[in-house]
Swiss-Prot record:
It comes from Nicotiana sylvestris (Wood tobacco). Its main location: other. This is Trypsin inhibitor 1. GO terms for molecular function: serine-type endopeptidase inhibitor activity. Mesophyll protoplasts and to a much lesser extent, roots and germinating seeds. Disulfide bonds join C26-C74. The record marks K70, D71 as: Reactive bond.
Amino acid sequence: MVKLALVVIFLLLASLFQPLTAQSSCPGNKKETWPELIGVPAKFAREIIQKENSKLTNVPSVLNGSPVTKDFRCERVRLFVNVLDFVVQIPRVG
């Protein structure tokens, strides 16, 4: 019975910490992903993203496979591109 109580307490505590560690969206952002931009040149993709959401001030191009930080930022969308500067992954806020 004590083990069951400990398991229940652990699960309750774990559920409290989950919202603190996993942020999936930003308040006020209407659109957070752009799957339609795969295969589009990065310059045009950047213009479309910033036109659709003016809060996104940081839209860098990143060569696909390059290391990036894991921090979540509501004002950033990374454009993962190939060597020809075409978008190869779905752009998303973060």
